[in-house]
Design a protein with these regions (language model features):
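Bacterial N-terminal signal peptides that target proteins for export
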Residues: 1-8
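Alpha-helical cap/lid subdomain in secreted, periplasmic
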Residues: 79-214, 218-236
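Catalytic-site microenvironment of enzymes
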Residues: 239
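Short N-terminal or domain-adjacent regulatory/targeting segments
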Residues: 2, 13, 21-22
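Conserved phosphate-coordination/catalytic loops
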Residues: 71-75, 116
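Bacterial N-terminal signal peptides
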Residues: 8-16
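Serine-esterase "nucleophile elbow" of acetyl-processing enzymes
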Residues: 19-70, 78-90
Length: 239
């Protein structure tokens, strides 16, 4: 009889203890580093941040028009390093790094050499993030939604391949967003792909409106959970 009465109490106490332990666990921090396809208003970064649990710090430092070279040259990587150096009490910090669009030729002051400079820049970001205790995650560039006939054009393939090679060489987690987003855009076709863009005068085949940001954030969520399984406790559907 006493055991029968005590068992519910034990179960309740155990559940409360587990909840308290979970609540007391140090939070996770996410830092986004990249270009306009990840940045606020034009990319998926904020929509991705909304998919993390409320106690997770998600900081979107991606900026439009930046390449793997100009992001550092402008001092923006210094902001990332300052965050990583400051005592913050996080259980883990993940730095998502996505470049490629503005590293392509024809962008004065931003373009980088694909063979040497671009991969060296990425590897340096990975190594410096690790040296400061963070987990770097490399992300291949989001596809452009440009079709030739019935087929989406893979004009970022060489830069995506370079990102994959750096991820292999540095043993960094990889999200192959280029491959995933290309497959998605190909599957839905040109008309539905156009609905992912910003409306009106801001329309183009690169940047994202709200629907596009939400769709890419959902793709990123699944890919991140595969690339970095510990994020499962803080990453889910949009809140």
């Amino acid at each position: 009889m006493l055991l029968d009465r005590a068992l519910p109490c034990l179960l309740i106490c155990a559940a409360a203890s587990a909840h308290a332990a979970s609540a007391a666990a140090p939070p996770v921090r996410i830092i986004l580093v990249g270009d306009s396809t990840m940045a606020s208003s034009t990319g998926y970064g904020d929509a991705l941040c909304a998919r993390f649990s409320p106690e997770t710090a998600c900081i979107n430092l991606a900026r439009g028009g930046r390449s793997s070279g100009s992001f550092r040259a402008e001092g923006r990587w210094d902001e990332v390093e300052a965050l990583l150096r400051a005592p913050a009490g996080f259980n883990a910090t993940y730095v998502l790094i996505q470049f490629g669009h503005n590293d392509q030729p024809g962008k004065p002051g931003r373009s980088t050499d694909l063979v040497h400079e671009f991969p060296a820049n990425l590897a340096r970001y990975v190594n410096e993030a690790r040296a400061l205790g963070a987990v770097p995650v490399l992300v291949t560039p989001l596809t452009r939604r440009s079709f030739r006939g019935a087929w989406v054009q893979d004009d970022l393939a060489p830069w995506s391949a370079a990102v994959r090679r750096v991820a292999t060489a540095t043993e960094a987690p990889l999200v192959d967003l280029n491959r995933l987003s290309m497959a998605d855009v190909q599957a839905i076709g040109p008309a539905r792909a156009d609905a992912l863009a910003r409306a009106g005068a801001n329309f183009d085949h690169t940047h994202l409106g709200p629907a596009g940001a939400a769709r890419v954030a959902a793709t990123m969520t699944g890919a991140l959970l595969r690339a970095a399984p510990p994020l499962a406790r803080v990453l889910g559907s949009a809140r």
